[in-house]
Amino acid sequence: MSGGGTETPTGCEAPSGGGGGGGRKRDSLGTTSSPAHLIIKDLGEIHSRLLDHRPVIQGETRYFVKEFEEKRGLREMRALENLKNMIHETNEHTLPTCTETMEDSLSHVLQRLQAATASVCRLQQREQERKKVHNDHLIASEKQHIMQWEDFMKEQHSKQADVDEEHRKAMEKLKEQYAEMEKDLAKFSTF
């Protein structure tokens, strides 16, 4: 189908012209304007226009690419221009405003942070003092309990010694009493 338009008139001319010497016949047909030749030529043009779309498609493709590149280039130029304007606006107005606001806010924040730090240091110091007093009290209380315990243990030992002494005396008394009772029993058993 493609390329058939240029070959069709040549194929039609050869049978009508006869055998060898086709170059002369073609020249003679080309110079004479016979109706068959004109019809064949018109048929070739119609055939090539109807069936050979390469030139049209190539033209349309070139036009589309050209339009696309131009529009894309304009779009990209507009996007770059907008970006440049945004950067300029940011550098000239937004950035200094943000810097000033940040410096003002940070100075207030720094003051509040220093005040909070001082408060925390005071609270920590008070807590440490309270813990020290509490620990000192615990140590003194523990020492007092140890001394009381030692006194208690000494008292218990002395009481134990007293009780042991009383018990020993009571045992001796009981032994003497039982020894005497045995003597008395021995006297009565002789009766």
UniProtKB/Swiss-Prot annotation:
PTM annotation (N-acetylserine): residues? S2
Q: Which GO terms describe its biological process?
A: anterograde axonal transport; anterograde synaptic vesicle transport; endosome to melanosome transport; melanosome transport; neuron projection development; positive regulation of pigment cell differentiation
Q: Which residues form a coiled coil?
A: 160-191
Q: Which InterPro entries match?
A: Bloc1s5
Chain residue ranges for the region called Disordered: 1-32
**What keywords does the record list, in alphabetical order?**
Acetylation, Coiled coil
Could you give one GO CC term from the UniProt record?
BLOC-1 complex
Q: Does the keyword Transport apply?
A: no
Assembly mode:
Component of the biogenesis of lysosome-related organelles complex 1 (BLOC-1) composed of BLOC1S1, BLOC1S2, BLOC1S3, BLOC1S4, BLOC1S5, BLOC1S6, DTNBP1/BLOC1S7 and SNAPIN/BLOC1S8. Octamer composed of one copy each BLOC1S1, BLOC1S2, BLOC1S3, BLOC1S4, BLOC1S5, BLOC1S6, DTNBP1/BLOC1S7 and SNAPIN/BLOC1S8. The BLOC-1 complex associates with the AP-3 protein complex and membrane protein cargos. Interacts with BLOC1S4, BLOC1S6, DTNBP1/BLOC1S7 and PI4K2A.
The record's function comment reads: Component of the BLOC-1 complex, a complex that is required for normal biogenesis of lysosome-related organelles (LRO), such as platelet dense granules and melanosomes. In concert with the AP-3 complex, the BLOC-1 complex is required to target membrane protein cargos into vesicles assembled at cell bodies for delivery into neurites and nerve terminals. The BLOC-1 complex, in association with SNARE proteins, is also proposed to be involved in neurite extension. Plays a role in intracellular vesicle trafficking.
Question: Matching PANTHER family, A to Z?
Answer: BIOGENESIS OF LYSOSOME-RELATED ORGANELLES COMPLEX 1 SUBUNIT 5 (PTHR31784:SF2)
Assigned protein family: Belongs to the BLOC1S5 family.
Protein's name according to its UniProt entry: Biogenesis of lysosome-related organelles complex 1 subunit 5
Encoding gene per record: BLOC1S5
